[in-house]
């Protein structure tokens, strides 16, 4: 975490070299709460795979029915959250205020209060993006904070959830059952889920670098039974255990992470897959759909 170190009652900031060392050493932040995460995983790599019109196609009746409500779990310092917001609303670079908040509202949460504070300070769309400090695995706090946000719009669930490179950190810190519960909570909270799972090689790298830094190893790493092809493992858990269906794979980022879109099966009648989106996938030969 990018938290100042207290020495002799004073606050001493990390030097640029120290901070850069921590940024480039995954495992230094055991919850994935790296400072300046976007330096080595820039938002543009995800955006190039995602159709800008995706939300309009999934929710053609908004904003007549109120804004689209999104949940971004593990938002870090908000760079990707802001980039997704601008991308899906086709907002030009440099725009800092917009009436688009009537179309799309995004609740962004992270376990690290320092990163959340930075996100709040730097967000160019404070009316549309809300940042909160939340340990998503704390059931009581999660229920209170998420329900408070949803109640403002008379809703009980989010339209879409974003889970971008978070599953590994939940898995390493909470074990197999923790990952299963995390995905259960997310699937119960959202009509759609966009998930970017980390592959197993990232688990090994995170554990190795943690040991290299002389820090305590992840409690669950060696006992995990869910391992191997992690994107497929995530698909199996969500589709077989949590009532979701995989409707789209948008391809892989340059760091070999797939972007997977799921839909809750109980929303099939109210949220049919847009034919235009299916055709676009066929034309570009990079989107795959499974229709029940």
Curated annotation (Swiss-Prot):
Catalytic activity annotation: a 5'-end 5'-phospho-ribonucleoside-RNA + S-adenosyl-L-methionine = a 5'-end (5'-methylphospho)-ribonucleoside-RNA + S-adenosyl-L-homocysteine; a 5'-end 5'-phospho-ribonucleoside-RNA + 2 S-adenosyl-L-methionine = a 5'-end (5'-bismethylphospho)-ribonucleoside-RNA + 2 S-adenosyl-L-homocysteine
Family of this protein: Belongs to the methyltransferase superfamily.
Gene Ontology MF terms in the entry: O-methyltransferase activity; pre-miRNA binding; RNA methyltransferase activity; small RNA 2'-O-methyltransferase activity; tRNA methyltransferase activity
Effect of residue 118 to A: Slightly decreased O-methyltransferase activity
Name of the protein this chain belongs to: RNA 5'-monophosphate methyltransferase
Subunit structure: Interacts with DICER1; the interaction may be mediated by RNA.
InterPro entries (alphabetical): Bin3-like, Bin3_C, BIN3_SAM-bd_dom, SAM-dependent_MTases_sf
Bin3-type SAM domain: residues covered: 53-274
Effect the entry attributes to changing residue 110 to A: Abolished O-methyltransferase activity
